[in-house]
Amino acid sequence: MINTVALFWALFIVCVVNMLRYYSSLRALLVVLRGCDPLLYQYVDGGGFFTSHGQPGKQLRLVRYIYERRYCDHHDGEFIRRCERLRRQFILTSALCGLVVVALIALMLWH
């Protein structure tokens, strides 16, 4: 029989690894964005994106830009591919985080 606590921790570790992959992909996207579209880079606060003084409103612009697939009309193919990858990773990470929360609640109820 599988230990439910061990299963929860395995799921949690997979979720954290996917969060790190998402973070890394977001950093790579900002590097590509700085080179191919400096105006959009400034619009989403690319320089201050991962700093403590970053502007959440501008950061949400990038999230909306990717979520609404506005990147499909962009002229740079690499940027489009990275946005697609980032969007898929965001969906996967969100689903895994939701699953971890559900598993934690179930674990608390059963133990």
Swiss-Prot record:
Q: Where in the cell is it found?
A: Cell inner membrane
The entry's keywords: Cell inner membrane, Cell membrane, Membrane, Transmembrane, Transmembrane helix
Say which domain of life the source belongs to. Answer: Bacteria
Which InterPro entries is this protein grouped with?
Universal_stress_protein_B
Question: Cellular component terms, GO, for this chain's entry?
Answer: plasma membrane
Q: How does it sit in the membrane?
A: Multi-pass membrane protein
Segments traversing the membrane: 1-21, 90-110
What Pfam families does the annotation carry?
Answer: UspB (PF10625)
Where does the record place a coiled coil? none
What family name appears in the similarity comment? Belongs to the universal stress protein B family.
- Protein name from the UniProt record: Universal stress protein B
Organism of derivation: Edwardsiella ictaluri (strain 93-146)
Phylogenetic lineage = Bacteria, Pseudomonadati, Pseudomonadota, Gammaproteobacteria, Enterobacterales
